[in-house]
UniProtKB/Swiss-Prot annotation:
Belongs to the COG4 family. This is Conserved oligomeric Golgi complex subunit 4. It is found in: Golgi apparatus membrane. InterPro entries: COG4 (IPR048682), COG4_C (IPR048684), COG4_M (IPR013167), COG4_N (IPR048680). Acts as essential component of the peripheral membrane COG complex that is involved in intra-Golgi protein trafficking. COG is located at the cis-Golgi, and regulates tethering of retrograde intra-Golgi vesicles and possibly a number of other membrane trafficking events. Possesses ATPase activity. Component of the conserved oligomeric Golgi (COG or Sec34/Sec35) complex which consists of eight different proteins COG1-COG8. It comes from Saccharomyces cerevisiae (strain ATCC 204508 / S288c). One of its GO terms (cellular component) is Golgi membrane. It holds the Pfam family COG4_C. GO terms for biological process: cytoplasm to vacuole targeting by the Cvt pathway; intra-Golgi vesicle-mediated transport; macroautophagy; pexophagy; retrograde transport, vesicle recycling within Golgi. Present with 1620 molecules/cell in log phase SD medium. It is a peripheral membrane protein. The keyword Chloroplast does not apply. Keywords: Golgi apparatus, Membrane, Protein transport, Transport.
Amino acid sequence: MEGQKSNASWESSIIEGQLSKNLARYTLLLDKLSTLSQIDKLSEVIANDYAKQSKQLNAFVQQSQSSLNKESRKLELQRTNLTTTLTQFHETVATISSSNARAKAIHDDIETVDQERALVNKTLQFVKDVRTLKNNISLAHSALETKDYLVAATAINEIRSLPDKKLIVSEFAKKVVPSSEIPEEPAILIKNWCKELTSLFQEQFMEATRTQDIKELTLMFKMFPMIGQDVLGLDLYSKYVCDIIADESRKIMSNSMENSTKFQGFFSQVLLHLFKIVSTIINDHSKVIATCYGKKHMVHVMEKVEKEADLQASLILDIFMETRKIERTIHDINEWEHSQKNEDVNIDSNQSDIETDGETEKSSIISIHDLALLIMEFSQILQNWSMYSRFYSVKWNEFSDLHPHVLQPPPPIADGKFALKLKQDKVFDEFQVFVLNHLQRSFRNSISLEELPSLNDLITAVPLNDHDNISYPVTSVLDDLILLVRKNLISVVNTGQFKLLASFLNELVKFFQNRFLVKFMQNKFKLLQSKLASNVSLKRYIPKGEEQSATSRSVSPPANKFSPLSRFTFRGAAASALTNIQSNLQAVVAEDEDSILALHHYLIYLNTLYLSKVYVHRLLSIEILEDDSQRILRDNFPFDNDAAQLQNLIINSEKLVLEQTDKLSKWAVKYLFQNILQNRVRNLLGTVFVNSASSNSSTSNQKNVSRDYSAGSNQKNYITSIEDFEDLSQINSFNSKWNQLIIPYKNILHNEAYAELLSVIVDYIVTTLEQRIWTLEFNELGVTKLDRELSLFIGNMCGLNYNLREKFLKLTQIVLLLGLDDDNFDLTTGDIKDDFNGTFDWVINSQERIKARNMKIDRTQ
């Protein structure tokens, strides 16, 4: 153990370079030797070190040799083990090689057996097929002799259905199948039989079509694919159903043609019946075709059927155009429209002439009633085509195994003769001409028959809260117009034609903008504005005849025939003067009554504008786009992305109409305020929020107060004491007079119209009061009184309408600022302190806040 430690220490000393260090030390000592004794000592140290190092080296060599011997023995032992393992490995490899050879031999044997089995099965199947061939030939031969064609066709079909198509021409079949009774080769025999049966089936099919023997016809039709004549069977069947379509169409037309001009809707029903026949054929006969021929062959029949349907539909359309004299009607309408454009009539100066233009039409033009019936029949024709196109497209995709994300019309529909005819003959354009002409002429008639309701029952200071959209007073023209637009819109939507509805929406926007808003509504407003007196007030209208019947006798001329100069007296002169005064008063009264009636009509037309927006939204958005009505577009416009595009068009059209209506309605409301209500509101405001406490002492002093808001005359209103702090008579009087002024308008006007009018009034009031409040002076009690008055003022005027209350924000902040304590203000700047400034979103700036504080006369300086 000690030897191992010494060896380890010696080895570590070698690794650490101890010998080199000792040598360097000896060299250094050698240089410093000066005496003999030092040399002896150095020699002794070197000898000791040498002996020590030699001993350690011997021990290290011995230890290393021993360790090396141990490792060598271990390696020898491992080599022995590896040799044994290698021997076993070679034995295993030899065993695997032997097994592999044996497995390959077995696999080869199995493959050989499988091949032999496959050959045996193939031979067996071949023999079975030959036997089937021979049996079916024998069966077909016997069936042909007994004229059992179904059995014969079934046997031939089984022969044709054999998996090996070359079996019938094989040498084995040629030798085995023929017999003494049937010596022909199978291939030649089957070919001759198919040819013979083809001719026979065709003759019997044609005979069955002539005799209408449906059972025989169906049997023959089923047997064509059995003998390999699929195309012939489909062609014959297609011709048969096309003949049915043509015969039915001619039968209907010939039976009812003599009464067609009297029977409106006749042609649409004929076309509907035609499409029903085609749809029934496609639905019912598709089962037979799919069973006997395969579903994919139904497309072939549908193509043939559609050609015949297009032909008959085009014929019906031609007869319709000729019988209803479409071309002549279009010509008359164009002439009428041209004559209307050439008439230079000023609607502003002579509204009645325009209103009766619709009645002074040429006698040759179609009547509005007949035009409406024609549009209905025309719409039904296009609707029938649209519904049939959708049905045909769905069935086409079903039989073609197509599953498109968006339904598209197949080529027989999109490129068919009838669709091409609708485009080339400009049928859509003609239909739109009818619709627009009906809309324009009917609107003219509704103007000529206009009725306006009476407002007398609504003119009261008592609020009426039972209004709905139906009960608002409007002109009868609006109701007629909405009914007309709805009727024509339904006719256009029912056609299912994207082009028609898109074009009609554009024309409808133009019609609303030009005919309704400008030529009718705007001209009505301008005509009434010329009749409105600035001092007119909203009160009940009493016709002149009822009011003056009692006084008409007193102002009638005398019955005598004497000259006025022959008997002049003071009494006669006084009577004459009285008569003249009464006549002048009556003229003034008549003028006032006309102005009152004009104001009534103005409010009715204002309601008409706002109700028209409600009706247009209901007509376009609610009835067509919202809730369950969304199916209207999807059902009538199923192709491509038509429904989504039309939805956007409808939304944009409504937006355009509402924008134009908003402009006109705001203009009308603004005129109503500026010319009728502004002076009255100004007079009412003259008594409130003013310096003079006696401003409401007399009525004659109100105008002067409203013009002079300075604080020069009597500054006591908001410099109050305990005695007059509770005096709110001014604001209560204003609220009472305000209610008397505004409630009749609220009872009459539509909510949105009233809200717009009130918004305009509030804007004016806010502007006036914001200018007036800077002229006031306050003490502490006066500020509190102002706060109470302003709260009552705003509450009575705005109610729960917070949008209107927001307009008074600047005034309320001024009052709030006046009520703040002096501690909240910075004495240096005069403005509120910074820590308090951040608690409010101020709409008044710093200068205004300083100015507002200076209005208090009892503040701390």
